């Protein structure tokens, strides 16, 4: 049986919880070099790799234990997923520049950083403060020196927004309007303005996965798209199809916008419900 955190108030309590969790994880995964530690948030070390996990002790009610197999193979999964989802057409080269809009907790950044190597650069943009803290932790602990994390929501104009927190963190989404009990304030920026401010000129690959906000983000990165070699924009019509709101139906808009930026478009026929909504853009040589 896994353990549950009750917001321990002291360093000693957290240290004891980390020791107990490490014992349980090692017992469940014999032969795996795993350690649970506290570094401003809960972190899981598996071999040489670190994975910040703010929800480590907040499992769904249906789960009595973590997915040990996933924990043991987390680094391999991140690398495999990037190859599957984002490197379908784009093939990274040492020295490339990748822009990751919707970087989450650093899952793809972990792979992107390795793919472009020390001479490359990854710009990782994530609006949710908890996810952004995990992203920073991942970059620091894994020494991803070629990654620059930025805490913004990419939109069509600058402004103050809210990011809504969902039970499954990957579904967090940006919106306008008043705060809610589950939202955080976030600064909205045009990516073209952010790119000018940060000196982002060359873009070999731009990935965007922002849970419906692609409808507003794409008009704010029109200049960047025109100088990118490859893009992959995730549309989210499947969220609209399951009743979460018509604003999530973005596929037609995304395809039109990407084509308008001069890209040829490729889609995938795939049984996974989200993969057919990845819009891959490439330029013919």
Q: Model-found features: residue ranges?
A:
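Glycine-rich adenosyl-binding loop in Rossmann-like folds that engage adenosine-containing cofactors
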Residues: 48, 52-86, 145, 150-198
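Hydrophobic pocket-lining residues within nucleotide cofactor-binding pockets
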Residues: 103, 154-156, 210
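Short helix-capping segments at alpha-helix termini
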Residues: 118, 140-145, 199, 224-227
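Conserved acidic-Pro-Pro-aromatic motif
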Residues: 193-285
């Amino acid at each position: 049986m896994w353990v549950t955190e009750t917001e321990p108030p002291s360093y000693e309590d957290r240290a004891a919880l980390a020791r107990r969790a490490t014992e349980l994880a090692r017992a469940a995964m014999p032969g795996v070099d795993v350690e649970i530690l506290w570094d401003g948030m809960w972190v899981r070390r598996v071999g040489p790799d670190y994975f910040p996990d703010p929800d480590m002790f907040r499992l769904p009610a249906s789960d009595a234990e973590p997915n040990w197999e996933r924990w043991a193979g987390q680094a391999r999964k991140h690398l495999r997923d990037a190859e599957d989802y984002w490197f379908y057409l784009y093939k990274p080269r040492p020295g490339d520049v990748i822009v990751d809009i919707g970087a989450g907790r650093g899952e793809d950044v972990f792979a992107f950083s390795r793919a472009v190597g020390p001479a490359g650069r990854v710009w990782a943009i994530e609006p949710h403060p908890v996810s952004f803290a995990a992203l920073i932790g991942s970059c620091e602990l894994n020494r991803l020196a070629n990654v620059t994390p930025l805490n913004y929501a990419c939109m069509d104009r600058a402004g103050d927004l809210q990011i809504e927190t969902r039970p499954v963190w990957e579904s967090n989404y940006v919106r306008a309007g008043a705060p809610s009990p589950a939202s955080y304030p976030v600064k909205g920026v045009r990516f073209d303005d952010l790119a000018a401010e940060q000196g982002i000129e060359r873009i070999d690959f731009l990935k965007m996965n922002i849970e419906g906000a692609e409808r507003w983000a794409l008009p704010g990165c029109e200049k960047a798209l025109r100088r990118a070699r490859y893009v992959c924009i995730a549309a989210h019509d499947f969220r609209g199809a399951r009743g979460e709101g018509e604003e999530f139906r973005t596929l037609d808009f995304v395809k039109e916008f990407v084509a308008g930026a001069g890209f040829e478009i490729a889609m995938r026929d795939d049984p996974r419900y989200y993969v057919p909504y990845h819009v891959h853009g490439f330029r013919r040589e």
